[in-house]
Amino acid sequence: MSQVAKDQKEQQIPSTVHRIRITLTSRNVRNLEKVCSDLVNRAKDKQLRVKGPVRLPTKILKITTRKTPNGEGSKTWETYEMRIHKRLIDLHSPSEIVKQITSIHIEPGVEVEVTIAQ
């Protein structure tokens, strides 16, 4: 009798659907797009509501320095830049399923941040 009561309690507890935001950042666009497409494809295979990937503006960090180490010679300048690309993916699903989806191979240089909201 107690086993039946436990089974009924388990059936009554609904799996709450959370809004999960996955933020991906990288300096390499190809690796970033590959990880995004893998995440979206796995989420669609599980029949989840997916919004994204949303492409956020690219941050361009620039440093300008003199080419010569001393002050002599012509004044020539060198410019270095680093581009940081960012993508957002929103999922509406229980947190257990997200653990299965995010267990993919993540390319080197891609940072993943997962935030869960109600």
Curated annotation (Swiss-Prot):
Keywords associated with the record: Cytoplasm, Phosphoprotein, Ribonucleoprotein, Ribosomal protein
InterPro entries the UniProt entry points to: Ribosomal_uS10 (IPR001848), Ribosomal_uS10_dom (IPR027486), Ribosomal_uS10_dom_sf (IPR036838), Ribosomal_uS10_euk/arc (IPR005729)
Main localization category: cytoplasm
Subcellular locations according to the entry: Cytoplasm
Disulfide bonds listed in the record: none
Any one GO cellular component localisation term in the record: cytosol
Claim: Ribonucleoprotein is one of the keywords in the record: yes
GO biological process: cytoplasmic translation; ribosome biogenesis
A UniProt-annotated Pfam family: Ribosomal_S10
Gene Ontology MF annotations: structural constituent of ribosome
Modified residues (Phosphoserine): 37
Organism domain of life: Eukaryota
Protein family: Belongs to the universal ribosomal protein uS10 family.
Physiological role: Component of the ribosome, a large ribonucleoprotein complex responsible for the synthesis of proteins in the cell. The small ribosomal subunit (SSU) binds messenger RNAs (mRNAs) and translates the encoded message by selecting cognate aminoacyl-transfer RNA (tRNA) molecules. The large subunit (LSU) contains the ribosomal catalytic site termed the peptidyl transferase center (PTC), which catalyzes the formation of peptide bonds, thereby polymerizing the amino acids delivered by tRNAs into a polypeptide chain.
Subunit structure: Component of the small ribosomal subunit (SSU). Mature yeast ribosomes consist of a small (40S) and a large (60S) subunit. The 40S small subunit contains 1 molecule of ribosomal RNA (18S rRNA) and at least 33 different proteins. The large 60S subunit contains 3 rRNA molecules (25S, 5.8S and 5S rRNA) and at least 46 different proteins.
Protein name (database record): Small ribosomal subunit protein uS10
Organism this protein belongs to: Schizosaccharomyces pombe (strain 972 / ATCC 24843)
Taxonomic classification: Eukaryota, Fungi, Dikarya, Ascomycota, Taphrinomycotina
Gene encoding the protein: rps20
